[in-house]
């Protein structure tokens, strides 16, 4: 995959990026050892980059409610449903690391219904996939069912919001042709 271009569109050089975006990309590269392709691809549109990552961080970096591993679980399952290779691979790597379960991401991406999930994780995935597939079918009874299974309103909202946000992310990565970095494939294994 490494010979593939980062995007079907113009990709800016790091030196040409606004300083706040450049600093964020440099910080990510320092932590991970590489620059994820999505950062470079989205940096071509600075205002969208800022808005995208502000929403991403708001949903994915919360310390209350869903765990960070549960948040990544949603991303992997719904990205697989949306056929987004970038998000499956990138967030699969993060899921493996955060869950400390090296097989989980592959299981969920291939068939979430046969994955080795806890009851709580299965309820999260079932609800996320319903939002992904047919959000109009969500009823008051379905929300009450999630509540009866121990989910708070904030957790239910976050499952839906993460699913919706990554539908956007999946479509951006797919139409722009953003490939996953090779480094993601082996992380957390």
For each predicted feature, which ranges?
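Hydrophobic alpha-helical segments
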Residues: 1-189
């Amino acid at each position: 995959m490494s010979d593939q271009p980062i995007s079907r569109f113009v990709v800016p050089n790091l030196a040409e990026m606004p300083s706040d975006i450049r600093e964020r990309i440099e910080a990510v590269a320092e932590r991970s050892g590489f620059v994820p392709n999505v950062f470079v691809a989205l940096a071509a549109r600075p205002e969208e980059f800022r808005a995208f990552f502000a929403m991403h961080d708001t949903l994915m970096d919360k310390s209350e409610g869903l765990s960070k591993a549960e948040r990544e679980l949603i991303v992997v399952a719904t990205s697989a449903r949306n056929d987004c290779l970038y998000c499956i691979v990138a967030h699969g790597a993060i899921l493996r690391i955060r869950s400390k379960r090296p097989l989980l991401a592959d299981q969920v991406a291939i068939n979430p219904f046969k994955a080795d999930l806890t009851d709580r994780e299965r309820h999260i995935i079932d609800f996320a996939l319903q939002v992904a597939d047919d959000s109009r079918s969500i009823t008051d009874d379905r929300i009450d069912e999630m509540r009866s299974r121990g989910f708070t309103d904030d957790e239910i909202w976050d499952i839906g919001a993460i699913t919706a946000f990554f539908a956007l992310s999946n479509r951006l990565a797919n139409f722009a042709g953003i490939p996953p970095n090779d480094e993601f494939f082996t992380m957390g294994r």
